[in-house]
Amino acid sequence: MRLIQAQTAIYVTAIFAVLISSCVRATELAIANFNNQAMHWTWGDYQYSTGPTQTRIYDPVDSTGGAGRSLGNLNLSSLADARWVVDFTKNAGNGSNNFSITLADSSDRRGTWTFNTTGVVTGTPTTMVSTTTLDSPTGGTDQANLDLSHISFFQIDGEWSNPNPFDFSFDNLKLSTEVAPPSPYPGYEADAPWRAEAAARIDAIRKADFNIHVTDATGRPVSGATVDVAMQQHEFGFGSAVTASRLRDNNLANAVYKQKVEQLFNIATLENDLKWPAWVGEWGSGFTQAGALAAVDWLQANDIDVRGHNIIWPGYSNLPNSLKQILDSAPLDASEQAALRAAINNRIDDIASRFAGKLSAWDVVNEPWDNHDVMDNLPEGNAAMADWFERVRANDPTAVLYLNDYNILSTGGATNTAKQQFYYDTLATLKNSGAPLGGIGFQGHFNESSLTGPEQVWEILDRFEALGLDMQITEFDFGTEDEQLQAAYTRDFLTAIFAHEGMDDFVMWGFWENAHWWPDAAMFRSDWSIKPNGEAYMDLVFDQWWTDETLASDAQGLAAIRGFKGKYLITVTLNGETVVVPATLTDGGLELAIALPVLAGDFDGDGKVDGRDFLVWQRNPGVGDLADWQANYGLSITTDLSSSVVPEPTALLLATITLLLSSKRNSFW
């Protein structure tokens, strides 16, 4: 790597020198070489020790904290497109999954760049490059306005809230415009080994054998029939959060939105309408109970399962004003605690009973790691959640009841964080208490610094699968301006989820830029043009993982295929006669018998097996045809067969209508 010699040596502090390019644009800048150089401060009980080539930064208790140095008033504006390059060694005893470089400007705005070290070998000198450039920090405080021309200090920070020790030795820290960007996440490469394993898993767990047996009206096998196997809907749930106000009426302005929902998804979550403040009218006229009910009815009418989100979000800021007024009196006395419990019970009774039988799932409690004000003000603490689950079940006997939280998968590859452990322990405690907990919700909100590789996703899911509960991705999105990276990770994350046996559904947290809390994460732009991540979704869900084939029945009347599990329409045609049959392919496969209103041996198609058919056969003899003619000679569709072997016209008509109306695969997009 080339280092342009500086015309003048500029010393940021007395401890280390910074070299600056004589050109307009610097290509490399040394920030610290850590050779017998002290840190200027530590925080969070961190310690450091210096050496001739390294500075060890550590905390034997936990990973929250860091150490920093002053930079005076350093101008880094010429290095806006540079990346961090850090040389370090992970020491024995380290339990942290990452560290971050933090820069602060003269106004104390801060930007951070996080380095995922989960795959780093202990004791091995390692060089890592930041995934983003200096002008694109992945976190911080008002980082979008970080003033690179007035940088006052840098810090090396540990992993927030990780209870394990932090222990790294740092050799060099510099900025470079010439270094190649790193792989954005483990497994990004086109030839990454996990891809073959995912394909094998998907074939094993998401597909099944489908054997279609075609017979004539007498039950004899029919060869040469055309068998169209047309998938209509996945068994696996692919869905999105949706806006009730766009579904609840016939406003033409929402026609495209509704059309997309109907075509693209078989499961949906009302994003905001069932949240407690919205439900009781505190969020304005755009949220009504009647509108929420109408939206759920519309989704059900279009064969889309509905998730309820959420019943209790137990943080102060997410509660209605009536609950806030109670909590404002904290610490609560016994009567106030009783009032708090009564308010929660009334909330559960109201909303759970209103939607009983309409929802496939409920997020009963949302984000308990960060939201626990209600539990903190009750003597039973987190045990109160078990009572809430019991009360929801009493009001709704069918919905699967979920706990839901974020930053379980979006960890930058970390597989054993404090939050993951808390979530696992909370789920296990609820289950062991006998609470009717049925599912685990993984939200999945990602940015460029929190991308977790597919194999790490599997490792995390394997751990939670051991609890024996349903598992869903409940709120996936990836917000970034890099649309190609967004598409690549959407493809790979969705593939990893579909390839994991414990996963049942994949729900995004919005799909259209004009109806998304994080517009950059949407699949469709405001003008409904599709983005690369949307194309990745379509390619997987409606092409690579979609079964739509045309077969021909063999001499035994068999048309066999291995298809993706879900709903199908099977269309069998021979000699101008057609039968359409709905079918569902699921675990264990399916043996489907379809009788055509024809007679084997009726080679001229006139509904009778007679001498004329023998003459036709003589001109074009086929294997088994003579036996068919002999077996059915003298029979007639109209006079000699019971009508029970011929599909009723009404059934055929209904199946055809279903074919036209229910297909989820459409060229509209």
Please provide the spans of the model-predicted regions.
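Short beta-strand-plus-loop segments that form exposed binding edges in beta-rich domains
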Residues: 155-163
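A cross-kingdom C-terminal cell-surface attachment/processing module
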Residues: 650-666
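Aromatic-rich peripheral "rim/lid" segments of glycoside hydrolase catalytic domains that contact
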Residues: 185-189, 340, 354, 363-382, ...
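Substrate-binding cleft and catalytic face of glycoside hydrolase catalytic domains
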Residues: 267-282, 290-409
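Short, threonine-centered small-residue motifs that mark membrane-proximal processing/anchoring sites
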Residues: 6-18, 23-28, 596-609, 623, ...
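Extracellular ligand-binding interfaces
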Residues: 55-142, 150, 163-169, 174-176
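Extracellular glycan-recognition surfaces and repeat-rich motifs
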Residues: 30-61
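Beta-strand-rich domain onsets/edges
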Residues: 178-247, 276-283, 307, 326-332, ...
